[in-house]
Each structure stands twice: as C-alpha cells, then as structure tokens.
Amino acid sequence: EKGQFSPSKGLDVTKLDESVKASFNMKEGYFYPVINTTNYMDSHGDVHFPNLWNKSLKDNEGGIYYVADHNLGIKSVIAFPKDVRVFTKTVDWAFVGKNYEGSTQALIYEIPIDKIQLNEAKNVINERIDIQNSVRMQYVKVFFAANSEHKDLTENRKLFFDYIDQIANKEVAMEQGYFYVVTEAKVVKEGSM
C-alpha cells in the first residue's frame, strides 16, 4: 500500500504519495533502507528510545558506510560514506510494516542507486528482496529497568514504569520483567544489509 514499506526492503519512493516524499525530502533514484527503529524490545532485551542517534550522526556526518554482513572489507562495501546520508525520522509503525499503535523513530540511510557498489546488493534492492538491515553500534547511555519490589532496585523500578508505555511490544517487556533503556548510542562506522 501507499505509505508503507518494509524496513528491510528499503523505501520504494515511486509508490509513495507526494506528501510523504516531501516530509522526508526523498528523491527518485535513491534507496532508503531503514537500519534501526526505536520503541521496540528486541531479543537482546534492549529498547532504543528516540533521539539516541542525534550526537553520533552529528559527530560522524559523512563517515558512515553501508556494507554487507557488517564487513568493512572492500568487497563488502555497498556504498561509501561520501554517498550515504544518514538521518532519523519519526513514522507510524504501519509505515515500517509493523502492526503496532503509535510511532517509532527510524534510522534511515539515503543512497543514490547508481552509487551502489556491490552487485549482490543491487540485486536485492532491484528485486525488493526482504533482507534484514542492522547497525553496528556502541551503547553510550544505557540503564537497567526492572519491575521489582526489591529495595535495592527502587530507581530501576521507576525507570521501568517511566518507559514501559513507550514500548510498542510492552507485553514482552512486562512478561520478562526487565529491559535495558538505551537513550544514547553511536553508529560505529557502518550499517549493514
């Protein structure tokens, strides 16, 4: 449908209405893979929260690769830093193909299709094959949140209830009883297909 895309397939600009294109400043002839999203508890038990990439993106402007399999070898580079613009955008979950209420902040790369270096990646992009993207990252600010009555975990319990309602799949966090709140992280050199 219009306005929806899979984060692993990237964004097909030709299928979006003009208002969506304008809100992202998107251009035809570019590939827009979603590398990461916020407000979701993953299998690692961490939850990224909006604006966690702000400092890193400013510090690394023009220095982030798009690669295959987190490999920075010359034969794995999909796009070099000079051709990768990295930004965040708050979007509805449906926009990234998920059936949750509310929104997420997506970490998105903008890459000219004619600058894609790796033939295997070109095929994945052209065929719109569903393949996972991810970011090589380093935590900067991470906090332990726990739904516990233990006297030594008072602050952790407060964190749990301060953040739980922002998590799209909060039932998973409630069942587990804890999660890691990530409020700042660094992109370490690359995002990967």
Q: Where on the chain are the PLM-derived regions?
A:
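Signature of dsDNA virion morphogenesis modules
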Residues: 1-193
